[in-house]
Amino acid sequence: MLVNVLTTGDDVSEKLKTYCNGLPDVDKKVMDAASDEGKGFMAAHGVSAAPMIVVLDEDGKELLKTINMDELVKFFA
């Protein structure tokens, strides 16, 4: 499982990044939404705004796309 964190440098981005960095047993990738990598990822996954969390399985299938912290916590519970 790969947790992708698209950030914008705001408080919400920091909270999401901090939570995801603390998750055990998952790969994590943090990207600045304004970077070329971030823009490419957003285009590829239909993300129109950041911050955003996109969780992918091993095959690249989207399991979760959210900015909602409660939804994120529930998913990993």
Predicted features, each with a name:
Residues M1-P24:
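Local sequence-structure signature of Cys/Sec-based thiol-disulfide redox active-site neighborhoods
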Residues N4-T8, D25-G38:
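Thiol-based oxidoreductase modules, predominantly thioredoxin-like and allied folds used
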Residues D11-V12, E37, E62, L72:
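Flexible, glycine-rich phosphate/dinucleotide-binding loops
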Residues E14-T18, G40, I67:
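Generic recognition of short, well-ordered alpha-helical segments
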Residues G38-H45:
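N-terminal beta-loop-helix "entrance" segment that forms/cooperates
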Residues H45-V55:
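Structural micro-motif
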